[in-house]
Each structure stands twice: as structure tokens, then as C-alpha cells.
Amino acid sequence: YSQRCGFVVYGGWPAAMEISEVSLAGEAGGEAFRLPVRATVLSGGVGSTAATHPYRMMMGRAWTLLKSGNLKQLLLKAKRYRAGKPGTHGDVVAAVRRQLEKNNCSRFMLVLDHDLGGGANNYREGLIRERMADGCGTLLLSFHLLSLQYSLEICTPGGRQRFSISGLDVLISLAEEGLISESFYNNAVSFEHPEDVPDLLVTLRSVYAIPLTLAMHDYYPICPSHFLLDASERYCGVPDIETCSDCLPKIDFWFVSFFESRDIRLWRSKWGACLESADSVLCFSNATRDLLLRAYPDLNTDRIDVVPHATGFFPARKPKLDMSTGLHIGILGEIGPHKGCDIVKALSEEIVTQNAATRISVIGTLEADCDPAVVTETGPYEASGLVDLVEASGANVFLFPSIWPETFSYVVDELMQLDVPIVCFDMGAPAERLRHYPKGKLIPLANARDILSQLKVFHEELARPMVIGE
């Protein structure tokens, strides 16, 4: 792989030719090195194999960050993706036994999670810390994208040790040895052959009686398009299965390509069995529960637990917002494609088209190239500094531009704690929260002109010859 060896080999051949093996051969000594075709061959000039799609996706996002001048953010993302590289090969079962004896534990909890960052990873790390505080350990199964390998990390109070494993069968071996106390599915987005994950969890539950909890951080158990975005990259609303069957093969973004069959009936069959076998399906909002039941109407609701995330942001004071200066849109967070960066870009272009005085302040980062006369960006922030950042920005109405029905939003919670006006699209957990928030407004996901118009109307409703706040 180019990211490890430092060079790239490329070539071409007739499209009709089937490639079964590619090797590098040294001219002098004749040494040969076989290349893994699935991971290296770009066919038809576009890299259409499932294994290469994440690389193309990440390159596209990297180019977007470069164009927008977000070099620091690009470096942070690159560092995150390179982290978590699988460690040494070895006898994992023996290593787990040694750590159990060393920590005086009988069994470890197994956690399945991606390594893509974000709220799901933060939640997982919280679980691991809780186990460590109790003197116990955790087995963390992940899939490392840059090396296309599974890793199993043994996490104990004494440290963390990461192993490279060949596949999911290793977990069956650990179960046979009685080394797993419970399974916790956190997230499997980006896992290779993701349809094998529910089969594994069902086996651990049914054959080895290992209790299972599934956490709904996104909608992966409903669809490989885990944000529920259809082929046109719009929220689908979980339609009938025929519509899904027509849509899924057309989707070419995110990690959908890892599910090579693109058969939504097969996907729902496997994940439906997994959901039925779970002891608890953990939802962080009623909106998530409702969408899950729309996809699986026969699912036993007794096993669904709605438990909102605990939040710890309580500002010492509320920011002062000046409503007399005209509409100034504030946006908080790390705004990538599914978080609405295209919405922000379209809004900025509409502001230019209308020659409006409206400005947009992004407190955080934005993966879009916008007119700097309209859009300013602070870069990453700490919650402790939010009050000062909000006041310094001049923003007086905040837009939450996410285009998918988020299962929970820490950003919305932070904005509510700041007691500022918030606008979001009428979907998911954010809408559920803002529906009962005095300074909240729900709007349909529409074109930039309509969104800007709704924001202006909301600002006019709020505007008075006074300063809101303390």
C-alpha cells in the first residue's frame, strides 16, 4: 500500500481482461511480491472495487479541505485515520488469558466500533473508562481503513495492547474459551463485509449465551447508507422496501460499497435477526426509536431502551446577542458533508446573489470553499470558550444545518445551554429537542433561497430594540 511503502505502481489493460494476480518482480534477483488485487487494482480507470472506494472518498474530502484552506483540519483528520493501526500478529487468545489473570478478571466485555472519530468513539471510550475504573478490561474490535485489517485491542487499567487479526473468527475462539462476558455493538460503519457483523453477534448470543447490547449511534442496522441518505444524497425517510431496493445499488458514497451485494432485503434480514436477539437496543432519542420501528415494525419494543446522552456543558453565563444588527447566521461544530457543508456553501452563494448584508460565522470548521467576505471560520473550539466565541462572532441566529436525522446532537445541546435562537431541519433528535425549546424553529430542508428567507423571518420575529442576554 502506498501509504506504507512510499511508492505507487500503476498500469492499464483491456477492460474485458480478468485480472487474477498482480506481482512485482525484481529484474536483478528475480524476487517476486504478490499484490492483493482487491486492495490495489483500480479497474476501468475509476477504482470501482469496494476496497478502494474509501480511499477515493478520503482523497475527495482531503481536496475539499485543501481548497478551503483547512490545512490544520486536514492534518488532524490524517493523524486520526493513521492512528489505530493494527499491531503485531500473535496468539490473541493467549494474550487475553494473560491479561485476565494479570488484572484478576474472569472475562472481558467485547466492544465493536469503527475508528472514524466523532461521538460514537467518544461514547465507546467512556465505556472503556468505566470498565477500567471497576478494575476490569475491554476487548475493542475495529477495522483499520488504511491497512484494511481488523484489529483487536486489549484495554486494561495497566495499558492497551493492539493485535492484528485475520477476521471475525478470532472472536468465536475467544467465546469458545469463555473469555467474553458481554457484547456491545457500538458501530460497524467502515467494516469490511459488514453483513458478517450481525451474524457474528447472533452467534455469540445464541450459541454462547453472551448478552448483547446494540447502540443506535446512526442507522447502520437499517441501511448501509448509515445516515439514511438516498442516491441523491437527501434524507430518505425510510420508505417502503421496494424503493430501498431500487435506491441502494445506485449509492456510491460513504462506505455503502463495502456491502457488495447491495441487497437491502438481505441486509434487513441479517440485522433484523440481530436486533431480535439483542437483550437491549439502546436509542438516544425517541426519533431514532420511531425510525427503527419504521424499518422493523415487528421488533419487540420491550427490548428498546431510550436513554438520551448525558451532557456536561453548563456555561457560567449566557452570551449577549445583538439582534439590531440584522441577520447574522451562526453555525457551530465540525461541518462536513452530512453535517451540511453544502447547505452552508449554497447559503453563502445566495447571500452574494442577493447582495445581502447577512454574514455567516462558523464556530468550528467547514469543509467547503466559501466567499471569505460572507463566511468566517474560527477553527476547532473548546466548549469552555463558547460564550466568548459566540459574542465575538456577532451571530444572533444559529443554524444547525445537518442533512440527516441525527440520533442525538451535542452541538444542539450546547446551543440550548447557551440559550440562543436555533433553527434546524425538521428531522431526527435535534428537531425532537427543539420542538419544545422556546427559541427553536423547525423548517423543511429546502433550497438555499427558501432557507435564507425562513432565517430572515425568524430573525425579524425575534428582533427588538434591545440586547438579548444578561
Language-model regions: role of each:
Residues Q99-L100, N104-C105, V111-G126, S190-E192, ...:
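A short, glycine/small-residue-rich beta-strand->loop->alpha-helix junction that serves as a flexible
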Residues V397-F398, P421-C424:
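Short hydrophobic beta-strand element within catalytic cores of glycosyltransferases
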Residues S206-V207, G237-S280:
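Membrane-proximal helix-turn-helix segments that form the acceptor-binding/catalytic region
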Residues Y1-G69, L76, A94-A95:
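Basic, ligand-binding patches in group-transfer machinery
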